[in-house]
Amino acid sequence: MEFNANRVDEANAVITATLTKDSIENNLEKVAKQAAKTMNVQGFRKGKVPVAVVKQRYADKLREDAEADGIRKILADGLKLLDIKNSDLIGEPSVTKFDKKDNGDIEVELSVACKPNIDLGDYKSLVPAVKAIEIDIKKIDDRLTEIAQSSAPLEKIARKRAVKDGDFAVIDFEGFVDGVAFDGGKAEKYPLQIGSGSFIPGFEEQVIGMKYEEQKDITVKFPESYQAKDLAGKEAVFKVTLHEIQERAKPELNDEFAQKMLPGQKDVTIDTLRDRVKEQMLAEDKAKYYRDELKPVFLETLVEKINFALPTSVIEQEINYALNNKIRTMTEEEINELKENANKVEDIRNELKEDAVNSVKATFIIDALAKAENVQVSDQEVTQVLYFEAMQMGQNPQDVIKQYQQAGYLPAIKMSMIEEKVISKLLDEKLGK
């Protein structure tokens, strides 16, 4: 059997071999004998089925298995020759050539992707300059006022007037599609905050200007993406009655309010709450500063300065992913043009390649940085983040986590969390110097 194994670079290898007809036939004989031991065939006792019968009935499947055994041996021999461990592989090696010859031989080529060897060098010198975050006292007081207003009780307005933006309009409503009332479209004495965007687009705007006890027909159209499929995209008429207008009571920023917001803590004053809000705002602003300003600069510098070989197959996967996303945004006419012209597809792939290379390179660098900095993210941490986000969106956390698991998104989420964690650690160190 002709055989050749070469390292293209540290991250890629190619193994070529000729799988001879004789070796395939020998493998086929072994596979057939093994199958005969366990196969149930009518007219024969289990384990006593003649090999010739097995070959006759399952010829195609047995030949596929025999060829696969040959490929596995080629791979094993190639990896051994190149001193590549299975733990060094990225994904499954791909069969890039499988050429059946007239004489029964098969010319095989296998492409192997390996974990790259990354020398980070003095990576901490590449961390960008970090400035300390400061919060204006007025912004802190504005946030305190927002918190107080959101928790203040609703009160009926002292003087009757028309509804304006920001009001809580207490309304009765009932919705109809094609003159027929639909489930979930009716409520009484419902406090709708105007401008909250909690109702169907266009509804709240038409409540503005209504007066006490006024009745009005409001016409809106359900979004195409509306969760109730029987209503999605349809026009609806809501019969609305305004009963009263409410607004938040004017909050008092005092020690009593602070004690309500920080229950169970001793000696709480409004200054205690102000300090707590300041800490939260500093953390929020720092996270935004790191994410939006410093992280892109840092990643760009890392990708530019740290060089190493990249696995070709991983880059191709990234290009395929980007290409599929791009196709989803195309019109039917544009997609048909691509189907008719393979060169256009290749042109797009070439356009996407640079970003794909940088993305793959950044991922490997982050992984290496995480190991160097001993940064880890547990499965429990991933679950906690998803749980919290689901609760914020009013969704069932268990359902959301299950959906992410089934879609195979958890590894990507973990990698994203590792990235944020290791970059924040390095930026914090820079800030502290």
Swiss-Prot record:
This is Trigger factor. It is an enzyme of class 5 (isomerase). GO terms for molecular function: peptidyl-prolyl cis-trans isomerase activity; protein folding chaperone; ribosome binding. It catalyses: [protein]-peptidylproline (omega=180) = [protein]-peptidylproline (omega=0). Its EC number is 5.2.1.8. GO terms for biological process: 'de novo' cotranslational protein folding; cell division; chaperone-mediated protein folding; protein transport; protein unfolding. GO terms for cellular component: cytoplasm. Its main location: cytoplasm. It is found in: Cytoplasm. Belongs to the FKBP-type PPIase family. Tig subfamily.
